Amino acid sequence: MVKIYRFLAIHHFIIAIGALFGGAAALINPYEPLGVPLELLEGSPFDNYLIPGLILFTIIGVGNLFSSCTAVKSSKHQGYISSVFSWGLMIWIVVQCIMINAIDFLHVLYFILGLLGAVLAMSILYEQRAFPTNLFGR
């Protein structure tokens, strides 16, 4: 179980670093963050990358950083915390692909990372007998 907590700490930290830098780039330059053209947002509800950058920075970046810190401390709630932010990452990727009407290698990679985090979070919950289906049998 200790290996899973360590892996999740590193896993969430790596995702957090990418999201914090990507989100910060979109907040600093919402019209062309890291060279990404505004044309990708055509057909989406956004005129620039300010709001997506804010969501990326706060929810995905800060959220995964929080999850990494709680994994380092082996929080008894880590299964729930990792699950929430892993599912959040997968939802973020799916919504992003729908809005820009494209799928790139990084989308697939981050979706798989989110799925891996969710599976490991569920294994923690199962091991702690805190998986939602186990709560009703107590």
Task: Label each region the model flagged.
Residues 1-138:
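Topology signature of small-to-medium multi-pass alpha-helical membrane proteins
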